[in-house]
Amino acid sequence: MHPFSRLFRNIQSLGEEEVQELLGPPEDALPLLAGEDLNHRVADALNLHLPTADLQWVHKTNAITGLYSNQAAQFNPHWIQPEFPELHLHNDLIQKLQQYFGPLTINEKRKLQLNFPARFFPKATKYFPLIKGIKNNYPNFALEHFFATANYLWTLWEAGILYLRKNQTTLTFKGKPYSWEHRQLVQHNGQQHKSHLQSRQNSSMVACSGHLLHNHLPSEPVSVSTRNLSNNISDKSQKSTRTGLCSYKQVQTDRLEHLARISCGSKITIGQQGSSPKTSYKSISSNFRNQTWAYNSSRNSGHTTWFSSASNSNKSRSREKAYSSNSTSQRYSPPLNYEKSDFSSPGVRGRITRLDNNGTLPQCLWRSFYNTKPCGSYCIHHIVSSLDDWGPCTVTGDVTIKSPRTPRRITGGVFLVDKNPNNSSESRLVVDFSQFSRGHTRVHWPKFAVPNLQTLANLLSTNLQWLSLDVSAAFYHIPISPAAVPHLLVGSPGLERFNTCMSSSTHNGNDSQLQTMHALCTRHVYSSLLLLFKTYGRKLHLLAHPFIMGFRKLPMGVGLSPFLLAQFTSAIASMVRRNFPHCVVFAYMDDLVLGARTSEHLTAIYSHICSVFLDLGIHLNVNKTKWWGNHLHFMGYVITSSGVLPQDKHVKKLSRYLRSVPVNQPLDYKICERLTGILNYVAPFTLCGYAALMPLYHAIASRTAFIFSSLYKSWLLSLYEELWPVVRQRGVVCTVFADATPTGWGIATTCQLLSGTFAFPLPIATAELIAACLARCWTGARLLGTDNSVVLSGKLTSFPWLLACVANWILRGTSFCYVPSALNPADLPSRGLLPVLRPLPRLRLRPQTSRISLWAASPPVSPRRPVRVAWSSPVQTCEPWIPP
């Protein structure tokens, strides 16, 4: 049925004879449909012209919102946070894959090397203050969202997905280190790494015996025992560790005094002749700036754990003994580690033994509330004093490594949303690294192939048994180089963010900036913390502290991540495909699809792949593993042997939205954009395709309103109620050729020549399109040869609207191949000349598979390699099945 038959009969400006002519033979109707006058008359009848500016626009239509209609995000206080398994790919992944699948191809090696490890080094990076770490997307649930997001980040850290910043040059994480992390090891499982300890001892001995004495002591030879010097300093360090009362400046002064005493004939004195130690320190320490050791008493055991007065004495003594036994391996510390440290030593009630960036003593907010008197009935002091042991202020992972300088800043904010539109019970972390997609810090991401609709139909429209697999937390499988951590920083500002007048640091030893901390003591905060305490328990203290973390695995908020994930999964699919040539295996992002002729054979392949993936460290989501039978559901489509159709849920959603559109009201262009996005998904399955939406495209491009008439709306509804599948292309030889001039057209086949003229001159592209439509109508050929690039592209939205709609209906399922004008046998008939008698050019269509590497011809598996399936395959190996 003609797509415009009902529409033309409902337009009163078109007479009955004119309608019959427009619906008549194509050689007469197609040139008329290209006329400008007819298109304007139909547009006036359908009210498709853009409205005037004095009308008031509609900004919301039921489920679709437009301009000035920001939809508030919904926070779920009962969100379930996902649990992440130990995601750790095998350390020698490429060698392990070669054991399973044999020698890898060049492309497979290249793709895997891009991901092992991934590298991300933008030219410029903007750093934001820590207070912007957690975005306040839910103002009514700010406190609940803050603790839920902080808990999500700590969950990722415990799974080995994030690094925790200890100081500006040190990172700590949980899990097994990779080979590139071994080179930066500081400590592993609480033990100081040998290479790091040896390098620190060597540098310290050289600094003591050589550089320092040469610059600041007399020129005559001096006998200095570096062993005694190091032991003396170590004894002082242990003593100060036990007492917990020695400051950083005092340690430096003691070391300078020791160097002065061992120098023979030196006149350097400290603390004598009426000069204060502070003055002497300032006058001398400048010469020792680059060679002074930083005293860090919490290198290995540095958790600030807070206990109440009742249970403090016994626990502190046991911690002192355990700590002093390990202090011999910590006698030297890198410079700046203590000055920039974010951790503290084992704490005693009311005492902090760490320094902040200004050399003063910062205060734990939780401890401060304990040591102050309650300000009222809703004071946080009542919550803090309810437990004797709140646990550590921070934690240290299994592995500590060195890193490039990492500032106390972040590069992107985080917040929580629903896991997907159909699952609001679970949460998903959103990382905003949009600075790398705009502005002067924009990064041009690499492009990768995405399967289009025709490619999926060509490759997957087969009568096979299908199975789909889903990689659990696929992005978090791919590791990142530690050097990229300073560009991928997230964090939490701590509970202090809810009181902007307060800072967690103190100045000159007093608590001047902590005097306003009781501004947090409100009824809302108090009741919220009580409810959160039921959820998190003593972990609430850890979540209330500020922290900074960097991604150790691939984050989802960077444009590089989809590219790297696509390379990784396509390389894995290529290996499986090469070893099982009798089945179909392809991957797109984190979805892996297997196809075989029988379900028994598919089960065997599935069991083998699961065991291989488990050994490699790739985790599959068992809950999302689905057996589809002969109807594969993939990317929102239903793929069968007869073609591809959209899933029912998309068709129902489209019909519901389209019926809710009001008639004869100007809708703003944002509503048109959102509606067009929904209609575009199903448009390839309609008779007129994308051309039916050209009036909406025009309104969106003009950034103006659009008015739906009742005729246009009913016509769209009739189009989208009748859907046709997209079928696979066939590899056939071209036997029909078409060509045109502005005044005539010509068609050449193997047995006849056809030609004709137009009633009036037409643009050359329009004439070529009409000639192709006539060739399709009269010969029924599925493959046409033409020399016009516009017709070859298949994009008909640049033609007159009525002609584009009818041409899309006629040429549906038709393929084109290019033939040069000199070799086109229809060229001379289109000019009204007799053609030269010569054979037709032999052009064969190759079905479109170039948009994605789902399948490629590969060499057979070596016969010496053991079979991959334990029992004999139902498919004969001598006749492998090859996708079309």
Swiss-Prot record:
Residues 1-184 are annotated as: Terminal protein domain (TP). Keywords: DNA replication, DNA-binding, DNA-directed DNA polymerase, Endonuclease, Host-virus interaction, Hydrolase, Inhibition of host innate immune response by virus, Inhibition of host RLR pathway by virus, Magnesium, Metal-binding, Multifunctional enzyme, Nuclease, Nucleotidyltransferase, RNA-directed DNA polymerase, Transferase, Viral immunoevasion. Pfam families: DNA_pol_viral_C, DNA_pol_viral_N, RVT_1. Its EC number is 2.7.7.7, 2.7.7.49, 3.1.26.4. The record marks Y68 as: Priming of reverse-transcription by covalently linking the first nucleotide of the (-)DNA. Coiled coil: none annotated. Activated by host HSP70 and HSP40 in vitro to be able to bind the epsilon loop of the pgRNA. Because deletion of the RNase H region renders the protein partly chaperone-independent, the chaperones may be needed indirectly to relieve occlusion of the RNA-binding site by this domain. Inhibited by several reverse-transcriptase inhibitors: Lamivudine, Adefovir and Entecavir. Residues 218-241, 299-345 are annotated as: Disordered. Residues 185-387 are annotated as: Spacer. Residues 388-729 are annotated as: Polymerase/reverse transcriptase domain (RT). Mg(2+) binds at D470, D590, D591. GO terms for biological process: DNA replication; symbiont-mediated suppression of host innate immune response. It catalyses: DNA(n) + a 2'-deoxyribonucleoside 5'-triphosphate = DNA(n+1) + diphosphate; Endonucleolytic cleavage to 5'-phosphomonoester. PANTHER family: REVERSE TRANSCRIPTASE DOMAIN-CONTAINING PROTEIN, RIBONUCLEASE H. HAMAP family: HBV_DPOL. Multifunctional enzyme that converts the viral RNA genome into dsDNA in viral cytoplasmic capsids. This enzyme displays a DNA polymerase activity that can copy either DNA or RNA templates, and a ribonuclease H (RNase H) activity that cleaves the RNA strand of RNA-DNA heteroduplexes in a partially processive 3'- to 5'-endonucleasic mode. Neo-synthesized pregenomic RNA (pgRNA) are encapsidated together with the P protein, and reverse-transcribed inside the nucleocapsid. Belongs to the hepadnaviridae P protein family. This is Protein P. It comes from Woodchuck hepatitis B virus (isolate 59).
